[in-house]
Design a protein with these regions (language model features):
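Glycine-rich beta-strand-centered segment in the early N-terminal region that forms part
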Residues: 20-35, 48-97, 138-141
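Residue-level recognition of short, solvent-exposed, well-ordered loop/turn junctions
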Residues: 23-25, 77, 166, 257, ...
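Local beta-strand N-terminus motif with an aromatic residue
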Residues: 79, 168, 213-214, 235-236, ...
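Glycine-rich cofactor phosphate-binding loops and adjacent beta1-alpha1 units
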Residues: 163, 205-285
């Protein structure tokens, strides 16, 4: 089978690999029907993910059909359409029991697929601890509707949840890339008083304006003053930093009112500075960390009910044998791309 593979820093390639086999009784083999490219894949390509293992098949956003299950797998069966969770987690350790599955202490725990073990930009993938990592897709939900459940949408849902958004809040979302838009969609479920999105790209601001017309829009240069003008208490009540650009962390906390929550969703290629002398007196609460992807079943229900729709994010579609072209478009942000669906 063909598999898009991390060869070395700066180089991915589509190569031949054998079809995976069950290794443990808790494994499942999934035939990938649809996948996508994530910015985290680009972080691997450029050497920003030290734990990524050269030689692995990349890709952690995928849906598919269960082809084979180990003897101990529960909850899914052969023939089920499923989402695949970006996080591999045992469900039994201290962190899993408390809902912090990103910190699972099992050998497979955390981000394994497409990072430490073979992922989903291929025809078949072995999913460890499949009882936890697979969720059955409702019959009325299409593959494209479910495509982002296991990662980028789970990230947005997690970010909105831990931000403790209330109906009285003004929410600032920094960044309107794929994760930022998924975060916006999930923040809207909380029905805050207003949402402001800060995004430098005119194309992406236009996308937000078209699909989410009630959202207020600004740019990084104008953001601080814009937030002051549109907030009741001199700053945003909740700030979700989803951009991960050079100065966006600083922008996020500066735009927060005293005693606000700042949730850092983004990944950074370089360390960020926390200027405590400048921040003294703001009494901010910071929340950080990787997605705790334990909400996938609930997210699928919301999609089934028509309360979440991420299909507008899919701007391009490519077959697996053209994945190099798809990566070029995604990495260079060409042709108005937001997300790319890769089909088999």
């Amino acid at each position: 089978m063909k598999a898009y593979t991390y060869i070395e820093k700066g180089k991915f390639a589509l190569i031949d690999k054998p079809k995976p086999e069950l290794q443990e009784a808790t494994d499942a083999i999934v035939r990938v029907t649809l996948g996508s490219i994530c910015s985290s894949d680009l972080h691997i390509k450029h050497g920003s993910v030290p734990r990524a293992v050269p030689g692995i098949t990349v890709g952690h956003e995928m849906v598919g059909v269960v082809e084979e299950v180990g003897a101990d797998v529960k909850g899914v069966k052969v023939g089920d359409r499923v989402t695949v969770n970006v996080e591999t987690f045992c469900g039994e350790c201290f962190y899993c029991r408390h809902g912090y599955v990103n910190n699972c202490t099992s050998p497979h725990g955390g981000w394994a697929l497409g990072c430490r073990i073979d992922g989903g930009q291929t025809d078949y993938v072995r999913v460890p601890v499949a009882s936890q990592g697979l969720n059955r897709i409702p019959d009325s939900v299409t593959d494209e509707q479910a495509l982002f459940v296991g990662d980028v949408l789970a990230t947005g849902f997690w970010a909105a949840r831990i931000s403790e958004i209330t109906p009285d809040d003004t929410v600032l979302i920094v960044g309107a890339g794929p994760t930022g838009i998924c975060t916006l969609i999930c923040a809207m479920l909380k029905r805050p008083k207003r949402i402001i999105v800060c995004e430098p790209s005119e194309e992406r601001r236009a996308f937000v304006k078209e699909h989410y017309p009630d959202v207020l829009l600004t740019t990084p240069d104008a953001c601080e003053e814009f937030v002051k003008q549109h907030c009741d208490h001199g700053g945003a009540d909740r700030v979700l930093e989803v951009a991960g650009a050079k100065n966006t962390f600083q922008l996020a906390w500066r735009c927060a009112r005293p005693n606000a929550f700042v949730t850092v969703v983004a990944l950074y290629d370089a360390p960020q500075i926390l200027p405590l002398p400048d921040m003294y007196g703001k009494n901010l609460t910071f929340k950080t960390g990787g997605v705790d992807g334990c909400d996938c079943e609930e997210v699928l229900r919301l999609i089934e009910q028509g309360k979440i729709d991420t299909t507008p994010l899919i701007t391009h579609r490519f077959p697996l044998d053209r994945i190099e072209e798809a990566y070029r478009i995604f990495e260079n942000k060409e042709d108005g791309v937001i997300k790319i669906a890769v089909y088999n």
